[in-house]
Amino acid sequence: MGLSLRAGNSETGDFVTDRETDLKIADDRGQFAARARELSLALGKDQEVFKQALDALLAVDNYRYAYLWSWMGVPIIQLPADIMATQEVIVATKPDVIIETGVARGGSVVFMASLLELIGRGKVVGVDLDIRPHNRQTIESHPMAKRIRLIEGPSTDPETLARVRGEIPPDSNVMVVLDSDHSRDHVLSELRNYGPLVTKGQYLVVADTLVGHIDESRAPKNRSKTWFKGDEPLTALNIFLQETNRFEVDPVINGKLVFSSSPGGYLRCIAP
């Protein structure tokens, strides 16, 4: 007789041991997904929960919380919720090319490349002003290196942009992640230059929008640079959204992102 914990009894935690009963349990996958969507939308409207989450994130940032995580042995410098959200987006949309500005230690490009490896196609193009030799060595010696291309140079420099475009085959589905310099003007320039590369149905992700929710008196001081409200990614994103009708803020993904450094930063491309 089989022993399993079935979805139909998950609220009580009861075990089902009757195989015939197992076969009669309804397929509730659609209902489960619909309920998750409903709760995500509701969570995204709960400002009190968001405030509590912000307080918690600022508290753990004293320990440089985002720096404590790695992916396949490489520091990723992201919060777990953002890693999960990016995974959901990539698996759902299956981009052929993912462009990320801001390589840092390489964990993020390795992470996205590993998902493309599971999908069975595609590559990640990592762009950074300064790719340190030891970080390059880590990335280029990694098992996922075959799906990674590194471009060193200012992300919005015409020569860099030309090299990035050269990595995009015709008719590719293109996703973009912006995670380099977080000043308003730089992010806005990246949005204007990289936004047009994103194809319909794919995502444009603007990292570290959380800074736009933090008062200057509470802004983390343990960084090489400090950004404040008005000079950060969220302000740039809002300006960009007023300039284009190609993108919308995904309410489901962003609704879940309360313990996140990028709330409101996941934009879905809705027009060619």
Regions found by a protein language model. Give the residues of each.
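Acidic/polar residues at beta-strand termini and the immediately following turn/coil
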Residues: 9, 24-26, 154
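Non-catalytic interaction surface on structured domains
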Residues: 50-54, 65, 71-72, 103
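N-terminal amphipathic/basic-hydrophobic helices that include classical n-h-c signal peptides
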Residues: 1-19
